[in-house]
């Protein structure tokens, strides 16, 4: 069976791959989750009948965690804060100076609505947009305020952080039960491992 691989390098001054188990004191995973990587791919190209399934991610800079604070003024503040129009201060532990190489494969979600090969069409659309620096929406490294300083083809001087070996006891994999138009059904992977700087995503 023919495969339709894609790949992308992303980098930025900050990233937040939020661990749900850290509650209100948000803390980042060391690498993007499956769903975060899928969202990055979809920021560049998407179809209703096909999607890009993340396969693995390579960590390309040393892990640096940093304390971060921001003022939240959205609708989820407490009633007394809303009443006096007060901000809620969010404290988080984020990653700084990050770089990743993400690999994926175009997969079918539903039968193609047209006679053309929609898997090849999505692959070509993705590769064309990456080469031209075009995207569907602004790429973010987790939180929307953490935009990229670079996204595009692999750069020759980027190196995998091969000294990095660690285990994440429980890591969010996906949020929905289907790759497209799914219902909320979070899935976690136990004992996810980053080995020689590489995190392979579960099927």
What are these regions (language model features)?
Residues 16-18, 65, 110-112:
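Residue-level signal for secondary-structure boundary sites
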Residues 1-24, 190-199:
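N-terminal, Lys/Arg- and Ser/Thr-rich interaction peptides
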Residues 1-3, 34, 95:
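Short, surface-exposed loop/turn motifs at beta-strand boundaries within globular domains
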Residues 19, 51-53, 113-115:
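Short, hydrophobic/aromatic beta-strand segments
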Residues 22, 27-70:
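Glycine/small-residue-rich interface belts in oligomeric ring/scaffold proteins
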Residues 10-14, 61, 102-110:
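Beta-strand elements of well-folded, non-transmembrane domains
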Residues 72-74, 79-203:
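Internal, well-folded beta-alpha domain core
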Residues 5, 54, 97-101:
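Extracellular structured ligand-interaction cores
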């Amino acid at each position: 069976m023919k495969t339709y691989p894609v790949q992308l390098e992303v980098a930025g001054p900050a990233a937040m791959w939020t661990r749900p188990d850290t509650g209100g004191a948000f803390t980042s995973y060391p690498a993007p989750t499956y769903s975060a990587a899928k969202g990055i791919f979809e920021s560049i190209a998407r179809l209703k009948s096909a999607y890009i399934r993340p396969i693995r991610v390579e960590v390309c800079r040393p892990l640096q965690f940093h304390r971060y604070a921001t003022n939240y003024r959205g609708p989820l503040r407490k009633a007394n804060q809303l009443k006096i129009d007060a901000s809620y201060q969010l404290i988080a532990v984020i990653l700084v100076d990050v770089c990743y190489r993400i690999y994926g494969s175009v997969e079918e979600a539903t039968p193609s609505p047209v006679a053309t090969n929609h898997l090849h069409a999505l692959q070509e659309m993705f590769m064309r947009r990456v080469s031209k620096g075009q995207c569907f929406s602004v790429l973010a490294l987790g939180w929307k305020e953490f935009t990229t300083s670079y996204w595009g083809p692999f750069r020759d001087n980027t190196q995998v952080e091969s000294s990095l070996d660690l285990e994440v006891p429980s890591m969010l994999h996906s949020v929905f039960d289907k790759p497209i138009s799914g219902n909320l059904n979070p899935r976690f992977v136990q004992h996810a491992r980053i080995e020689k700087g590489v995190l392979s995503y579960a099927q």
